[in-house]
């Protein structure tokens, strides 16, 4: 309920409502703590290049599909990529390798999707550097690591930063909890590229910007991947009851 209300305030209101004005002190505190976290972080550099795919807003924007596509493109060009992720929604925080037969509650649904669709090694862990080190120890052939989410996880050194936005853009442009931003929009000037997932307007920065479009293929059960259903078959049908 609260999440839906905040989404409306962040992305549908052009001006700050009185309720959001009351949250301004929390936004200032969040900004201060975020800056301290970045300043105090001691980045761990892995022995292979690291590409971080993240975003500035809370919630999904298309990071996982882009990570999957990048893994496929790197493989096609002779690289041996591996993927690390936080694994949101899982029961633990430790480093866990993700296999095709892993359970979503153990590794997270998005890392499980990546493991099944990408065909590359995947490892989850709250500490991405530890997850990357474990992945490299188990798969020494890996020569590049993709980090699905983790733009704000400064404990992991990175060589390339890609930021994804969807059609909602940056919302009202304010920091959490007044707006949806984890970091200020000025951060866009320091990343390597901005990827717009059906983004309607561009940001006024010189950072290279590219467009992407997601197209549904088929659905399958996470607990039984053999059961599939094409997206076309579900056209016009209600899915929630």
What is the predicted function of each stretch?
Residues 1-12, 54-61, 191:
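Membrane-proximal helical "anchor" segments flanking the first transmembrane region
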Residues 55-57, 151, 216:
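Short, well-ordered turn and helix-capping elements at secondary-structure junctions
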Residues 2-49:
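A transmembrane-helix-recognition feature enriched in membrane-embedded lipid enzymes
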Residues 87-211, 218-222:
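Phosphate/Mg2+-binding loops and adjacent switch elements
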Residues 43-47, 155, 232-235:
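Short, flexible hinge/linker loops that cap or flank conserved catalytic cores
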Residues 2-3, 11, 26, 82, ...:
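Residues lining hydrophobic/aromatic ligand-binding pockets adjacent to catalytic sites
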Residues 38-100:
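Walker A (P-loop) phosphate-binding motif
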Residues 50, 80-82, 143-146, 238:
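Residue-level preference for the first positions of well-ordered beta-strands
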